[in-house]
C-alpha cells in the first residue's frame, strides 16, 4: 500500500475518497496524480473550512472536484462531497448536503451509510460500512444517543472526533460534556470556525441551565475569537452555532 493510502487511513473523512482506487495498489505502482491531488486539496479544504478561511476552502474544494471529475466517476465525486459535509458537521453547520444529494443515486452503499450517519440517522446495517473510528459512535446512537459520549471521547484523532461529536449532537446527544469536548477539540487545533460554533452552543446551554458564571466565561472566549477573526471566520462560526441553537435544550 502506498504512503498516500496510509495518510488517508489516518484521516477518517478523507480516507473514503481513494479507498477503491488505492485498495489494490502495490509499492511498485504509485497512486495516480489525480488521486493524490484530490486528496491533498480535500485535506486543505477541510482545514480551511474549519478555520473559517472562506475563499481558501472554496478554491480547494473546487480543485478537489475538478481532479475527481477528470475520472468521469460520479461515485468518487459523491465521496468528495461527503468530505465537505463532514467538515460542516464538525463545525455544526447542518444541512442536507445538497452537493452529495445531487450524486446520491451513484453513491456506493458505504457513502450512503456515511451520509445517514452525518445526519445523525444511522441504521443498524450501516455500522459495518462506516469508517472504523465512527462505528462505535454509530452503534451507540442506535441505542441511546446519550451513551455516545464515551465512544466519541475514545476517538483520539481530532477531525474524526469532531465529526463524531457533531453527528452525535445532531442525533440528540446534547450533553454538556459533549459540548465541552467539541469546543476543546476544535480549540486545540486552532479551528476558529468550529471553535466558535461549539462555544456558542455551549454558552446557550449554560444560559438555559442558569449557569451565569460559566456562560460569561465562554463568551469571553468568543469575544477573543471575534476580535481576532479574519476572512469571515467570525460570521461563519456565528451562523453555524445559530443553526443548531435549539439542540442544547433537547
Region spans (language model):
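Residues that mark the junctions of alpha-helical repeat units in TPR/alpha-solenoid scaffolds
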Residues: 30, 37, 56, 77, ...
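Structural register within alpha-helical repeat arrays
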Residues: 44-45, 84, 163-166, 182, ...
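Alpha-helical linker/edge segments of TPR/alpha-solenoid repeat scaffolds
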Residues: 84-110, 121-130, 207-214
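TPR repeat positional signature
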Residues: 41, 60, 76-77, 81, ...
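Short, charge-rich amphipathic alpha-helical segments embedded
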Residues: 64-95, 188-197, 226, 231
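Sec-dependent bacterial lipoprotein signal peptides
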Residues: 1-25
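Bacterial Sec signal peptide processing site at the extreme N-terminus
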Residues: 19-44
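Extended amphipathic alpha-helical interaction segments
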Residues: 110-191
Amino acid at each position: 500500500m502506498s504512503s498516500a493510502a496510509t495518510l488517508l487511513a489516518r484521516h477518517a473523512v478523507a480516507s473514503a475518497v481513494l479507498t477503491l482506487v488505492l485498495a489494490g495498489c502495490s509499492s511498485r505502482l504509485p497512486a495516480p496524480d489525480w488521486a493524490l491531488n484530490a486528496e491533498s486539496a480535500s485535506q486543505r479544504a477541510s482545514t480551511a473550512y474549519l478555520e473559517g478561511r472562506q475563499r481558501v476552502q472554496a478554491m480547494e474544494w473546487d480543485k478537489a472536484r475538478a481532479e475527481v471529475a477528470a475520472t468521469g466517476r460520479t461515485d468518487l465525486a459523491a465521496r468528495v462531497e461527503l468530505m465537505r459535509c463532514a467538515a460542516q458537521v464538525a463545525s455544526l453547520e447542518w444541512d442536507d448536503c445538497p452537493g452529495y444529494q445531487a450524486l446520491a443515486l451513484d453513491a456506493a452503499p458505504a457513502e450512503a451509510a456515511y451520509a445517514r450517519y452525518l445526519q445523525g440517522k444511522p441504521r443498524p446495517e450501516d455500522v459495518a460500512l462506516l469508517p472504523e473510528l465512527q462505528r462505535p459512535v454509530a452503534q451507540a446512537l442506535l441505542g441511546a444517543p446519550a451513551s455516545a459520549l464515551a465512544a466519541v471521547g475514545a476517538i483520539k484523532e481530532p477531525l474524526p472526533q469532531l465529526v463524531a461529536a457533531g453527528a452525535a449532537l445532531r442525533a440528540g446527544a446534547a450533553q454538556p460534556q459533549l459540548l465541552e469536548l467539541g469546543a476543546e477539540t476544535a480549540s486545540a487545533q486552532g479551528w476558529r470556525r468550529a471553535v466558535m460554533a461549539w462555544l456558542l452552543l455551549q454558552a446557550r446551554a449554560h444560559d438555559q441551565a442558569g449557569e451565569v458564571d460559566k456562560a460569561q466565561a465562554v463568551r469571553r472566549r468568543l469575544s477573543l475569537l471575534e476580535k481576532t477573526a479574519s476572512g469571515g471566520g467570525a460570521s461563519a462560526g456565528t451562523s453555524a452555532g445559530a443553526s443548531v441553537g435549539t439542540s442544547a435544550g433537547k
